[in-house]
From Swiss-Prot:
UniProt main location, coarse: membrane
Subcellular location: Cell membrane
UniProt keyword list: Antibiotic resistance, Antiport, Cell membrane, Hydrogen ion transport, Ion transport, Membrane, Plasmid, Transmembrane, Transmembrane helix, Transport
Transmembrane segments: 12-33, 81-100, 111-129, 140-162, 165-185, 201-221, 223-240, 256-276, 297-317, 324-344, 346-365, 432-451
Name of the encoding gene: tet
One Gene Ontology molecular-function label: antiporter activity
Name of the protein this chain belongs to: Tetracycline resistance protein
Length: 458
Protein backbone atom coordinates (compact mmCIF):
# COMPACT_ATOMS: atom_id res chain seq x y z
CA UNK A 1 0.00 0.00 0.00
CA UNK A 2 2.85 2.40 0.88
CA UNK A 3 4.56 1.47 -2.38
CA UNK A 4 1.38 2.24 -4.33
CA UNK A 5 1.03 5.59 -2.54
CA UNK A 6 4.69 6.46 -3.24
CA UNK A 7 4.32 5.62 -6.94
CA UNK A 8 1.15 7.71 -7.18
CA UNK A 9 2.85 10.62 -5.41
CA UNK A 10 5.89 10.35 -7.71
CA UNK A 11 3.61 10.38 -10.76
CA UNK A 12 1.81 13.51 -9.53
CA UNK A 13 5.13 15.27 -8.90
CA UNK A 14 6.40 14.35 -12.37
CA UNK A 15 3.22 15.73 -13.96
CA UNK A 16 3.67 18.94 -11.98
CA UNK A 17 7.29 19.36 -13.09
CA UNK A 18 6.38 19.14 -16.79
CA UNK A 19 3.40 21.47 -16.29
CA UNK A 20 5.76 24.03 -14.73
CA UNK A 21 8.02 23.82 -17.80
CA UNK A 22 5.03 24.42 -20.10
CA UNK A 23 3.87 27.36 -17.97
CA UNK A 24 7.32 28.97 -17.94
CA UNK A 25 7.73 28.84 -21.72
CA UNK A 26 4.13 29.92 -22.26
CA UNK A 27 4.97 33.21 -20.53
CA UNK A 28 8.23 33.60 -22.48
CA UNK A 29 6.30 33.05 -25.70
CA UNK A 30 4.05 36.02 -24.93
CA UNK A 31 6.90 38.50 -24.44
CA UNK A 32 9.63 36.87 -26.52
CA UNK A 33 9.78 39.59 -29.20
CA UNK A 34 8.63 42.61 -27.20
CA UNK A 35 12.05 44.15 -26.47
CA UNK A 36 13.09 43.49 -30.09
CA UNK A 37 10.24 45.43 -31.69
CA UNK A 38 12.46 48.43 -32.63
CA UNK A 39 15.02 46.07 -34.20
CA UNK A 40 12.28 44.31 -36.18
CA UNK A 41 10.85 47.66 -37.28
CA UNK A 42 14.31 48.71 -38.44
CA UNK A 43 15.01 45.44 -40.28
CA UNK A 44 11.75 45.58 -42.22
CA UNK A 45 11.53 49.38 -42.40
CA UNK A 46 8.02 49.23 -40.91
CA UNK A 47 6.20 51.73 -38.65
CA UNK A 48 5.10 50.64 -35.13
CA UNK A 49 1.52 50.21 -36.40
CA UNK A 50 2.71 47.30 -38.55
CA UNK A 51 5.54 46.01 -36.35
CA UNK A 52 3.35 45.64 -33.26
CA UNK A 53 1.38 42.98 -35.12
CA UNK A 54 4.26 40.67 -34.22
CA UNK A 55 2.82 40.70 -30.69
CA UNK A 56 -0.82 41.39 -31.57
CA UNK A 57 -1.02 38.36 -33.88
CA UNK A 58 0.17 36.09 -31.08
CA UNK A 59 -2.18 37.57 -28.46
CA UNK A 60 -5.16 37.39 -30.80
CA UNK A 61 -5.04 33.64 -31.40
CA UNK A 62 -3.77 33.10 -27.85
CA UNK A 63 -6.83 34.78 -26.29
CA UNK A 64 -9.35 33.05 -28.55
CA UNK A 65 -7.50 29.76 -28.19
CA UNK A 66 -7.62 29.75 -24.38
CA UNK A 67 -11.42 29.90 -24.55
CA UNK A 68 -11.61 27.25 -27.27
CA UNK A 69 -9.29 24.76 -25.55
CA UNK A 70 -11.17 25.20 -22.28
CA UNK A 71 -14.47 24.34 -23.95
CA UNK A 72 -13.01 21.38 -25.86
CA UNK A 73 -11.20 19.79 -22.89
CA UNK A 74 -14.17 17.59 -21.95
CA UNK A 75 -15.04 16.65 -25.53
CA UNK A 76 -11.58 15.79 -26.88
CA UNK A 77 -9.58 15.19 -23.71
CA UNK A 78 -6.66 17.09 -22.20
CA UNK A 79 -4.01 14.71 -23.50
CA UNK A 80 -4.92 15.18 -27.17
CA UNK A 81 -5.30 18.95 -26.86
CA UNK A 82 -1.99 19.44 -25.03
CA UNK A 83 -0.17 17.39 -27.67
CA UNK A 84 -1.87 19.37 -30.43
CA UNK A 85 -1.00 22.69 -28.75
CA UNK A 86 2.67 21.81 -28.27
CA UNK A 87 3.08 20.61 -31.88
CA UNK A 88 1.33 23.67 -33.35
CA UNK A 89 3.40 25.99 -31.14
CA UNK A 90 6.66 24.38 -32.27
CA UNK A 91 5.50 24.36 -35.90
CA UNK A 92 4.92 28.11 -35.68
CA UNK A 93 8.39 28.55 -34.18
CA UNK A 94 10.04 26.73 -37.08
CA UNK A 95 8.10 28.73 -39.70
CA UNK A 96 8.98 31.99 -37.95
CA UNK A 97 12.69 31.19 -37.68
CA UNK A 98 13.06 29.89 -41.24
CA UNK A 99 11.00 32.72 -42.72
CA UNK A 100 12.09 35.56 -40.42
CA UNK A 101 13.29 37.59 -43.42
CA UNK A 102 9.71 37.87 -44.70
CA UNK A 103 7.42 40.06 -42.60
CA UNK A 104 4.15 38.42 -43.69
CA UNK A 105 5.58 34.97 -42.88
CA UNK A 106 6.72 36.20 -39.46
CA UNK A 107 3.21 37.47 -38.67
CA UNK A 108 1.68 34.18 -39.84
CA UNK A 109 4.12 32.28 -37.62
CA UNK A 110 3.08 34.36 -34.60
CA UNK A 111 -0.59 33.59 -35.34
CA UNK A 112 0.28 29.88 -35.36
CA UNK A 113 2.40 30.13 -32.20
CA UNK A 114 -0.46 31.82 -30.34
CA UNK A 115 -2.92 29.12 -31.43
CA UNK A 116 -0.62 26.45 -30.01
CA UNK A 117 0.55 28.24 -26.86
CA UNK A 118 -3.06 28.94 -25.86
CA UNK A 119 -3.36 25.29 -24.81
CA UNK A 120 -0.92 25.77 -21.94
CA UNK A 121 -2.77 28.22 -19.64
CA UNK A 122 -6.15 26.79 -20.67
CA UNK A 123 -5.30 23.17 -19.84
CA UNK A 124 -2.57 23.29 -17.19
CA UNK A 125 -5.02 24.31 -14.48
CA UNK A 126 -7.47 21.61 -15.62
CA UNK A 127 -4.70 18.99 -15.36
CA UNK A 128 -3.89 20.12 -11.82
CA UNK A 129 -7.58 19.94 -10.86
CA UNK A 130 -7.95 16.42 -12.29
CA UNK A 131 -4.62 14.77 -11.49
CA UNK A 132 -3.23 16.39 -8.34
CA UNK A 133 -4.76 15.23 -5.01
CA UNK A 134 -7.03 17.77 -3.35
CA UNK A 135 -4.72 18.22 -0.36
CA UNK A 136 -1.83 19.22 -2.65
CA UNK A 137 -3.68 21.38 -5.19
CA UNK A 138 -3.07 24.64 -3.33
CA UNK A 139 0.68 24.03 -3.36
CA UNK A 140 0.52 23.01 -7.03
CA UNK A 141 -1.35 26.15 -8.08
CA UNK A 142 1.03 28.24 -5.98
CA UNK A 143 4.09 26.62 -7.58
CA UNK A 144 2.78 27.17 -11.10
CA UNK A 145 1.92 30.77 -10.23
CA UNK A 146 5.48 31.29 -8.96
CA UNK A 147 6.94 29.76 -12.13
CA UNK A 148 4.79 32.07 -14.27
CA UNK A 149 5.93 35.07 -12.21
CA UNK A 150 9.55 33.97 -12.58
CA UNK A 151 9.09 33.67 -16.35
CA UNK A 152 7.66 37.17 -16.50
CA UNK A 153 10.60 38.37 -14.41
CA UNK A 154 13.61 36.82 -16.12
CA UNK A 155 12.05 36.80 -19.60
CA UNK A 156 13.01 40.36 -20.67
CA UNK A 157 16.61 39.89 -19.54
CA UNK A 158 17.00 36.56 -21.36
CA UNK A 159 15.41 37.66 -24.64
CA UNK A 160 17.18 41.04 -24.55
CA UNK A 161 20.59 39.38 -24.31
CA UNK A 162 19.84 36.87 -27.09
CA UNK A 163 18.48 39.56 -29.42
CA UNK A 164 21.43 41.89 -28.80
CA UNK A 165 24.32 39.43 -28.95
CA UNK A 166 22.94 36.92 -31.50
CA UNK A 167 19.78 37.97 -33.41
CA UNK A 168 16.11 38.43 -32.58
CA UNK A 169 15.11 35.61 -34.96
CA UNK A 170 16.64 33.04 -32.57
CA UNK A 171 14.05 34.06 -29.97
CA UNK A 172 11.45 32.29 -32.08
CA UNK A 173 13.16 28.97 -31.33
CA UNK A 174 12.76 29.27 -27.54
CA UNK A 175 9.23 27.73 -27.50
CA UNK A 176 10.69 24.64 -29.25
CA UNK A 177 11.98 23.53 -25.84
CA UNK A 178 8.41 22.54 -24.91
CA UNK A 179 8.68 19.56 -27.28
CA UNK A 180 10.69 17.70 -24.61
CA UNK A 181 7.56 17.48 -22.44
CA UNK A 182 5.59 15.44 -25.02
CA UNK A 183 6.84 11.87 -24.33
CA UNK A 184 6.60 12.35 -20.57
CA UNK A 185 3.12 13.92 -20.54
CA UNK A 186 1.81 11.32 -23.00
CA UNK A 187 3.04 8.61 -20.64
CA UNK A 188 1.88 10.23 -17.39
CA UNK A 189 -1.57 11.49 -18.46
CA UNK A 190 -4.35 8.92 -18.64
CA UNK A 191 -6.36 8.12 -21.75
CA UNK A 192 -9.64 9.97 -21.38
CA UNK A 193 -13.14 9.11 -22.52
CA UNK A 194 -14.42 11.55 -25.11
CA UNK A 195 -17.71 13.23 -24.27
CA UNK A 196 -19.99 14.22 -27.11
CA UNK A 197 -21.10 17.83 -27.08
CA UNK A 198 -21.96 20.83 -29.22
CA UNK A 199 -19.26 23.29 -30.20
CA UNK A 200 -20.21 26.73 -31.51
CA UNK A 201 -17.84 26.96 -34.49
CA UNK A 202 -19.90 29.61 -36.27
CA UNK A 203 -19.86 31.82 -33.17
CA UNK A 204 -16.07 31.57 -32.85
CA UNK A 205 -15.57 32.45 -36.53
CA UNK A 206 -17.90 35.47 -36.38
CA UNK A 207 -16.29 36.77 -33.19
CA UNK A 208 -12.77 36.20 -34.53
CA UNK A 209 -13.53 38.08 -37.75
CA UNK A 210 -14.95 40.97 -35.73
CA UNK A 211 -11.87 41.12 -33.49
CA UNK A 212 -9.33 40.85 -36.33
CA UNK A 213 -10.94 43.60 -38.40
CA UNK A 214 -11.29 45.86 -35.36
CA UNK A 215 -7.56 45.48 -34.67
CA UNK A 216 -6.81 46.19 -38.33
CA UNK A 217 -8.88 49.36 -37.98
CA UNK A 218 -6.88 50.48 -34.93
CA UNK A 219 -3.62 50.25 -36.88
CA UNK A 220 -4.74 51.50 -40.31
CA UNK A 221 -7.83 53.60 -39.43
CA UNK A 222 -9.60 52.31 -42.55
CA UNK A 223 -13.38 52.73 -42.21
CA UNK A 224 -13.99 49.59 -44.29
CA UNK A 225 -12.28 47.49 -41.59
CA UNK A 226 -14.47 49.07 -38.92
CA UNK A 227 -17.65 48.39 -40.92
CA UNK A 228 -16.74 44.70 -41.36
CA UNK A 229 -15.94 44.47 -37.64
CA UNK A 230 -19.24 46.02 -36.54
CA UNK A 231 -21.27 43.85 -38.93
CA UNK A 232 -19.49 40.70 -37.70
CA UNK A 233 -20.21 41.55 -34.06
CA UNK A 234 -23.88 42.32 -34.82
CA UNK A 235 -24.30 38.97 -36.58
CA UNK A 236 -22.42 37.29 -33.70
CA UNK A 237 -24.78 38.79 -31.09
CA UNK A 238 -27.80 37.67 -33.12
CA UNK A 239 -26.28 34.20 -33.50
CA UNK A 240 -25.54 33.53 -29.80
CA UNK A 241 -29.12 34.42 -28.91
CA UNK A 242 -30.42 31.61 -31.12
CA UNK A 243 -28.11 28.65 -30.46
CA UNK A 244 -28.52 26.37 -27.45
CA UNK A 245 -24.86 26.28 -26.37
CA UNK A 246 -23.27 29.56 -27.56
CA UNK A 247 -19.57 30.37 -27.38
CA UNK A 248 -20.44 33.36 -25.15
CA UNK A 249 -23.47 33.33 -22.85
CA UNK A 250 -25.69 36.24 -24.03
CA UNK A 251 -27.26 36.44 -20.57
CA UNK A 252 -24.03 37.91 -19.21
CA UNK A 253 -24.60 41.01 -21.35
CA UNK A 254 -27.65 41.85 -19.24
CA UNK A 255 -25.52 41.91 -16.07
CA UNK A 256 -24.46 45.57 -16.23
CA UNK A 257 -22.30 45.40 -13.11
CA UNK A 258 -20.38 42.43 -14.49
CA UNK A 259 -19.92 44.03 -17.92
CA UNK A 260 -18.61 47.29 -16.42
CA UNK A 261 -16.06 45.36 -14.35
CA UNK A 262 -14.89 43.30 -17.33
CA UNK A 263 -14.75 46.32 -19.66
CA UNK A 264 -12.89 48.62 -17.25
CA UNK A 265 -10.53 45.83 -16.19
CA UNK A 266 -9.81 45.06 -19.84
CA UNK A 267 -9.11 48.74 -20.58
CA UNK A 268 -6.62 48.92 -17.70
CA UNK A 269 -4.86 45.70 -18.74
CA UNK A 270 -4.77 46.80 -22.39
CA UNK A 271 -3.38 50.23 -21.52
CA UNK A 272 -0.50 48.74 -19.53
CA UNK A 273 0.22 46.15 -22.26
CA UNK A 274 0.33 48.97 -24.80
CA UNK A 275 2.70 50.95 -22.57
CA UNK A 276 5.03 47.97 -22.14
CA UNK A 277 5.12 47.49 -25.93
CA UNK A 278 5.99 51.20 -26.28
CA UNK A 279 8.93 51.09 -23.83
CA UNK A 280 11.50 49.59 -26.28
CA UNK A 281 10.69 52.23 -28.92
CA UNK A 282 10.82 54.97 -26.28
CA UNK A 283 14.15 53.88 -24.81
CA UNK A 284 15.72 53.55 -28.27
CA UNK A 285 14.52 56.96 -29.48
CA UNK A 286 14.92 59.03 -26.30
CA UNK A 287 17.92 57.40 -24.58
CA UNK A 288 19.53 55.36 -27.41
CA UNK A 289 19.69 52.16 -25.34
CA UNK A 290 20.55 48.76 -26.79
CA UNK A 291 18.12 45.83 -26.83
CA UNK A 292 20.09 44.10 -24.05
CA UNK A 293 19.95 47.22 -21.85
CA UNK A 294 16.21 47.64 -22.43
CA UNK A 295 15.50 44.04 -21.45
CA UNK A 296 17.87 43.60 -18.50
CA UNK A 297 18.19 47.13 -17.06
CA UNK A 298 14.89 48.86 -17.84
CA UNK A 299 12.19 46.14 -17.87
CA UNK A 300 13.75 43.33 -15.79
CA UNK A 301 13.51 45.00 -12.31
CA UNK A 302 9.85 45.86 -12.91
CA UNK A 303 8.88 42.35 -13.94
CA UNK A 304 10.67 40.87 -10.92
CA UNK A 305 8.89 43.30 -8.60
CA UNK A 306 5.54 41.79 -9.68
CA UNK A 307 6.25 38.82 -7.39
CA UNK A 308 6.60 41.10 -4.34
CA UNK A 309 3.64 43.31 -5.24
CA UNK A 310 1.46 40.25 -5.85
CA UNK A 311 2.23 38.96 -2.35
CA UNK A 312 1.59 42.37 -0.75
CA UNK A 313 -1.63 42.77 -2.75
CA UNK A 314 -2.95 39.44 -1.49
CA UNK A 315 -2.32 40.45 2.13
CA UNK A 316 -3.99 43.85 1.65
CA UNK A 317 -7.07 42.28 0.05
CA UNK A 318 -7.58 40.12 3.14
CA UNK A 319 -7.06 43.03 5.54
CA UNK A 320 -8.56 46.05 3.76
CA UNK A 321 -10.71 44.66 0.96
CA UNK A 322 -10.39 44.55 -2.86
CA UNK A 323 -11.61 48.09 -3.58
CA UNK A 324 -8.89 49.51 -1.33
CA UNK A 325 -6.25 47.53 -3.24
CA UNK A 326 -7.78 48.56 -6.58
CA UNK A 327 -7.52 52.21 -5.53
CA UNK A 328 -3.82 51.74 -4.74
CA UNK A 329 -3.21 49.95 -8.04
CA UNK A 330 -4.94 52.65 -10.09
CA UNK A 331 -3.03 55.35 -8.17
CA UNK A 332 0.31 53.64 -8.86
CA UNK A 333 -0.51 53.41 -12.57
CA UNK A 334 -1.87 56.91 -13.13
CA UNK A 335 0.78 58.70 -11.03
CA UNK A 336 3.58 56.70 -12.71
CA UNK A 337 2.36 57.62 -16.20
CA UNK A 338 1.90 61.26 -15.20
CA UNK A 339 5.38 61.44 -13.63
CA UNK A 340 6.94 59.90 -16.74
CA UNK A 341 5.06 62.49 -18.84
CA UNK A 342 6.93 65.30 -17.08
CA UNK A 343 10.31 63.63 -16.59
CA UNK A 344 10.74 61.35 -19.61
CA UNK A 345 13.97 62.96 -20.84
CA UNK A 346 15.77 62.52 -17.50
CA UNK A 347 18.23 59.64 -17.05
CA UNK A 348 17.16 56.24 -18.37
CA UNK A 349 17.27 54.58 -14.95
CA UNK A 350 14.34 56.77 -13.95
CA UNK A 351 12.16 54.74 -16.34
CA UNK A 352 13.24 51.60 -14.48
CA UNK A 353 11.61 52.98 -11.31
CA UNK A 354 8.51 54.00 -13.26
CA UNK A 355 8.12 50.49 -14.69
CA UNK A 356 8.45 48.98 -11.20
CA UNK A 357 5.44 50.99 -10.02
CA UNK A 358 3.50 50.49 -13.27
CA UNK A 359 3.82 46.71 -13.09
CA UNK A 360 3.24 46.85 -9.33
CA UNK A 361 -0.01 48.72 -9.95
CA UNK A 362 -0.95 46.18 -12.61
CA UNK A 363 -0.25 43.35 -10.16
CA UNK A 364 -2.58 44.93 -7.59
CA UNK A 365 -5.26 45.42 -10.24
CA UNK A 366 -5.01 41.86 -11.56
CA UNK A 367 -5.27 40.57 -8.00
CA UNK A 368 -8.62 42.24 -7.32
CA UNK A 369 -10.48 42.48 -10.66
CA UNK A 370 -11.48 38.76 -10.61
CA UNK A 371 -12.65 39.13 -7.00
CA UNK A 372 -14.91 42.12 -7.56
CA UNK A 373 -16.19 40.91 -10.93
CA UNK A 374 -17.11 37.47 -9.55
CA UNK A 375 -19.17 39.18 -6.82
CA UNK A 376 -21.62 40.36 -9.51
CA UNK A 377 -22.28 36.83 -10.77
CA UNK A 378 -24.88 34.31 -9.67
CA UNK A 379 -23.61 30.85 -8.83
CA UNK A 380 -24.85 29.38 -12.14
CA UNK A 381 -23.12 32.20 -14.06
CA UNK A 382 -19.73 31.84 -12.37
CA UNK A 383 -18.13 29.42 -14.86
CA UNK A 384 -19.17 31.27 -18.02
CA UNK A 385 -18.54 34.67 -16.43
CA UNK A 386 -15.01 33.98 -15.24
CA UNK A 387 -14.14 32.33 -18.57
CA UNK A 388 -15.27 35.50 -20.34
CA UNK A 389 -13.18 37.63 -17.96
CA UNK A 390 -10.11 35.47 -18.63
CA UNK A 391 -10.69 35.69 -22.39
CA UNK A 392 -11.21 39.47 -22.24
CA UNK A 393 -8.04 39.95 -20.18
CA UNK A 394 -5.85 38.21 -22.78
CA UNK A 395 -7.65 39.86 -25.69
CA UNK A 396 -7.39 43.35 -24.21
CA UNK A 397 -3.61 43.02 -24.03
CA UNK A 398 -3.41 42.25 -27.74
CA UNK A 399 -5.83 45.06 -28.52
CA UNK A 400 -3.83 47.51 -26.39
CA UNK A 401 -0.62 46.62 -28.22
CA UNK A 402 -2.33 47.11 -31.60
CA UNK A 403 -3.89 50.45 -30.63
CA UNK A 404 -0.65 51.87 -29.21
CA UNK A 405 1.19 50.75 -32.35
CA UNK A 406 -1.33 52.71 -34.39
CA UNK A 407 -1.02 55.78 -32.15
CA UNK A 408 2.78 55.73 -32.43
CA UNK A 409 2.38 56.09 -36.19
CA UNK A 410 0.16 59.22 -36.07
CA UNK A 411 2.19 62.41 -36.80
CA UNK A 412 -0.48 64.59 -35.15
CA UNK A 413 0.43 63.16 -31.73
CA UNK A 414 4.08 64.09 -32.20
CA UNK A 415 3.46 67.67 -31.02
CA UNK A 416 4.82 69.64 -28.08
CA UNK A 417 2.41 69.99 -25.12
CA UNK A 418 4.76 70.97 -22.30
CA UNK A 419 5.81 74.65 -22.14
CA UNK A 420 9.24 73.86 -20.69
CA UNK A 421 12.16 72.93 -22.92
CA UNK A 422 12.03 69.24 -23.73
CA UNK A 423 13.75 67.19 -26.39
CA UNK A 424 11.73 66.71 -29.56
CA UNK A 425 12.18 62.93 -29.38
CA UNK A 426 9.98 62.87 -26.25
CA UNK A 427 6.92 64.64 -27.72
CA UNK A 428 5.09 61.57 -29.01
CA UNK A 429 5.81 59.37 -26.00
CA UNK A 430 5.01 62.09 -23.44
CA UNK A 431 1.64 62.76 -25.06
CA UNK A 432 0.77 59.07 -24.99
CA UNK A 433 1.81 58.79 -21.34
CA UNK A 434 -0.59 61.62 -20.50
CA UNK A 435 -3.33 59.81 -22.42
CA UNK A 436 -2.58 56.55 -20.56
CA UNK A 437 -2.86 58.34 -17.21
CA UNK A 438 -6.27 59.76 -18.11
CA UNK A 439 -7.59 56.40 -19.32
CA UNK A 440 -6.47 54.65 -16.12
CA UNK A 441 -8.04 57.31 -13.86
CA UNK A 442 -11.40 57.18 -15.65
CA UNK A 443 -11.52 53.35 -15.78
CA UNK A 444 -10.49 53.05 -12.13
CA UNK A 445 -12.97 55.64 -10.87
CA UNK A 446 -15.86 54.07 -12.79
CA UNK A 447 -15.07 50.59 -11.45
CA UNK A 448 -14.59 51.69 -7.83
CA UNK A 449 -17.71 53.88 -7.75
CA UNK A 450 -19.98 51.35 -9.46
CA UNK A 451 -18.97 48.47 -7.19
CA UNK A 452 -18.81 50.65 -4.07
CA UNK A 453 -22.46 51.60 -4.51
CA UNK A 454 -23.57 48.10 -5.47
CA UNK A 455 -23.37 46.93 -1.84
CA UNK A 456 -21.75 43.67 -2.94
CA UNK A 457 -20.13 41.40 -0.39
CA UNK A 458 -16.50 40.89 -1.38
Amino acid sequence: MNTSYSQSNLRHNQILIWLCILSFFSVLNEMVLNVSLPDIANDFNKPPASTNWVNTAFMLTFSIGTAVYGKLSDQLGIKRLLLFGIIINCFGSVIGFVGHSFFSLLIMARFIQGAGAAAFPALVMVVVARYIPKENRGKAFGLIGSIVAMGEGVGPAIVGMIAHYIHWSYLLLIPMITIITVPFLMKLLKKEVRIKGHFDIKGIILMSVGIVFFMLFTTSYSISFLIVSVLSFLIFVKHIRKVTDPFVDPGLGKNILFMIGVLCGGIIFGTVAGFVSMVPYMMKDVHQLSTAEIGSVIIFPGTMSVIIFGYIGGILVDRRGPLYVLNIGVTFLSVSFLTAFFLLETTSWFMTIIIVFVLGGLSFTKTVIPTIVSSSLKQQEAGAGMSLLNFTSFLSEGTGIAIVGGLLSIPLLDQRLLPMGVDQSTYLYSNLLLLFSGIIVISGLVTVNVYKHSQRDF
